Amino acid sequence: MYKRQADTIGRAVAEKYHLHFMDREAIAASAKEAGCYDEYEEFYSERPVNSLLYSIVMETEEDNVLHDTPGRALTFIDRLPLEDGCEGYVIQGRCANFAFQGRDDVVSVFLTANDAFCVDTVADTHGVSVRKAKTVVRETNDNRKTYHKYYTGQEWGQAENYDLCLNVAKLGVDGVIAMIDSFIQNRK
């Protein structure tokens, strides 16, 4: 869900565990430095997927070549030098749950919240009307849902695709951070 405090939560977890936080901008900048941005520009920029192209692609075989894109597009992250005492990365979005699935050194988290929470956050953060905020939240969520399905074949936000799914509206930012911390400390 759009505007569910992912930046704030991701940065706090990164700081606590001495990790670099990588959002869309940081991933794109690092991909440019690594020389792989041009090959996966649409993936890095999270451009809305063309609905006609999406329909054609989804009608083809299940193991679509596009489903390899997140893994290929994010491989450079494992080769980035770790600086400032950091021990790894918190990656926001970019189908990272899919790209890094099955790894013991990865925890994938999906943050959710009800529409009212997201709309209020957008309206407050960007100083727009509730009506405009509703449109922005709906369109952004629809684009992300389509983007995730297009590149992974998975439903965005489905619990089985993540280690943790947490509701920011119910837990608050501090509660979500505490739950992530507890999961990391107690996982086997």
Regions of interest found by a model, annotated:
Residues D7-L19:
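A conserved segment at the C-terminal end of the G1
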Residues L19-K32:
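Short beta-strand-centered segment that lines the nucleotide-binding/catalytic pocket of NTP-utilizing
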Residues V49-I56, H67, V130-D174:
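Small-molecule kinase domains that catalyze NTP-dependent phosphoryl transfer to phosphate-bearing small molecules
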Residues L80, D84, Y89, G93-G102:
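RNA pseudouridine synthases
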Residues R94, F98, G102, F110-A116, ...:
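Long, contiguous binding/interaction regions
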Residues G102-T140:
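Conserved phosphate-donor/acceptor-positioning beta-strand/loop module used by diverse small-molecule
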